[in-house]
């Protein structure tokens, strides 16, 4: 008998993502005081023709007006319990995953450190953004920011110090 060497099993390689994707724009909503989570979630849901606003999300997520924080699991729970949509949340995301989700047609709600620092009055704080596009050629992400502006560009990468806290 002749011994034949087994050929290596081919390794599947991921399909490369396109260099640029921009989703249709959800309805922009400027946040009320300390209301970036409810406002950004409302913008996200408007992408799916939800028809309500941050007054609805805020009333459920922050019934106490002095509450300045909404956790990611609370946002997902709101979607799963108060709408006909389904949401999940994860820690440890990366830029490739954000791009893959946007490429698949899903805006991505992320939590990062707030910038610009000149607008912060009480030290570090978290802030939600809704990523709706990217362009690798010019190293650019496009996000809706409920505090700063409707269509906020990020040049290059998400600054690591703003992202690391949530990974």
Model region roles, listed by residue range:
Residues 20, 55-167:
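Conserved active-site-adjacent core of cysteine acyl-enzyme catalytic domains
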Residues 1-72, 114, 122, 136-138:
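Active-site-adjacent structural segments surrounding the nucleophilic cysteine of cysteine proteases
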